[in-house]
């Protein structure tokens, strides 16, 4: 029995209040996480860890970064070999991937098609397409790669199938069709059941908005697979076209608006002439920079970070940032962002500060 005027808390009240306050406080806690996340990865650290290894993670939530979309690493393998000793298929994954070749020349087999590359070229690997890389040069092939692995893992749809580890395959071991499909599970059912099953006549549902929406859902996988195979894959470095923007000279590389079938990640290269500076801006998406040439510094929020060729910068979400070239040669910066993802969910905002020289 309670005292007059007092109220008894409903069962589970404290738990619900705690969970609600976790949501209310999330934004401020996220700011703290961004402030604690590493920003600058110097080349010396990368070289030290890369020695004796064929790959090193540079930006990843599992090594202390507050990255929710982008994973970035450096990879390499010896002359005359295939990466990871792959011999037939390589691997595939339900993440977007963009590769930039730093050193060497060779070719890749991606979804059964050969693409020849050399230093300075880019590869945009379609989601869930088997791919493997062959080094034809007389030196190590070295590349940096950016993928959307953290996002796929975070929402529970990450699938990585590697020819060396068939015991972990989820779909590839079932039959040849599953190995060729770019849509996980798409060919598990008979042909007549895929998309809109044959026994269903869409005409019987004319005028039904709900049915139209559902039929679009049934057709989506087939359209998605076709779009992945039609998307661009190879970009030659010699074909980059730098154009002037408020942020400076920029060459877009991989973008959904340029014929690439990407929905999460975009890639560009920025160029800053000696003694010049980029524009300043901030945006509500992740960004990872890798310095391809030059030396200088960046102001990220109120902190200064010195950089040179081979360094990496992980720009915290919604942090003001600007780059300065204090060297004698043009600075070129490889930029990967999660902008398309934020546009697709309606949370994209970019704010311009100082305009580039």
Where are the regions that the model predicts?
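A short, N-terminal "cap"/entry segment at the start of jelly-roll beta-barrel domains
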Residues: 2-71, 162, 168-263, 349-352, ...
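Conserved short histidine dyad/triad with adjacent acidic residue
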Residues: 54-60, 73-92, 249-255, 268-283
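Conserved hydrophobic/aromatic beta-strand scaffold that supports enzyme active sites
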Residues: 55, 72-76, 98, 114, ...
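Short, low-complexity cationic-aromatic patches
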Residues: 63-67, 80, 89-91, 135, ...
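A structural feature that tracks compact, well-ordered secondary-structure segments
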Residues: 73-75, 267-271, 280, 296-298, ...
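A short beta-strand-loop-beta hairpin characteristic of the jelly-roll/cupin
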Residues: 82-87, 92-119, 129, 277, ...
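Ligand-binding loop in jelly-roll beta-barrel domains
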Residues: 127-154, 261, 308-309, 317-343
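Short peripheral tails and domain-boundary helices/loops at the edges of structured domains
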Residues: 150-163, 340-355
């Amino acid at each position: 029995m309670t005292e007059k005027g007092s109220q008894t808390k409903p069962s589970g009240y404290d738990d619900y209040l705690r969970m609600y306050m976790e949501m209310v406080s999330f934004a401020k806690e996220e700011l703290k996480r961004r402030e604690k996340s590493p920003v600058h990865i110097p080349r010396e650290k990368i070289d030290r860890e890369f020695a004796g290894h064929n790959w090193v993670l540079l930006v990843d939530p599992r090594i202390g970064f507050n990255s929710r979309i982008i994973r970035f690493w450096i990879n390499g393998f010896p002359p005359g070999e295939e990466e990871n000793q792959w011999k037939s298929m390589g691997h595939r994954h339900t993440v977007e991937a963009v590769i930039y070749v730093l050193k060497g020349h060779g070719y890749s087999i991606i979804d059964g098609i050969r693409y020849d590359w050399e230093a300075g070229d880019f590869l945009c690997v379609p989601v869930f397409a088997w791919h493997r890389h062959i080094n034809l040069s007389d030196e190590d092939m070295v590349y940096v790669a950016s993928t959307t692995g953290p996002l796929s893992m975070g929402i529970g749809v990450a699938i990585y199938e590697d020819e060396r580890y068939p015991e972990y395959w989820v779909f590839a071991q079932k039959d040849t069709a599953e190995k060729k499909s770019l849509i996980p599970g798409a060919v598990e059912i008979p042909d007549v059941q895929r998309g809109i099953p044959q026994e269903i006549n869409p005409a019987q549902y004319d005028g039904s908005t709900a049915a139209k929406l559902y039929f679009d859902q049934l057709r989506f996988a087939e359209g998605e697979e076709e779009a992945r195979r039609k998307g661009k894959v190879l970009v030659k470095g010699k074909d980059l076209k730098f154009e002037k923007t408020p942020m400076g000279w920029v060459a877009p590389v991989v973008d959904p608006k340029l014929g690439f079938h990407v929905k999460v990640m975009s890639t560009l290269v920025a160029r800053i002439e000696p003694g010049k500076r980029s524009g300043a801006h901030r945006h509500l998406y992740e960004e990872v920079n890798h310095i391809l040439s030059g030396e200088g510094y960046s102001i990220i929020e109120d902190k200064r970070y010195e950089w040179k060729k081979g360094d990496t910068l992980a720009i915290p979400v919604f942090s003001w940032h600007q780059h300065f070239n204090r060297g004698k040669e043009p600075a070129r910066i490889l930029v990967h962002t999660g902008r398309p993802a934020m546009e697709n969910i309606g949370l994209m905002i970019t704010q311009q500060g100082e305009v580039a020289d």
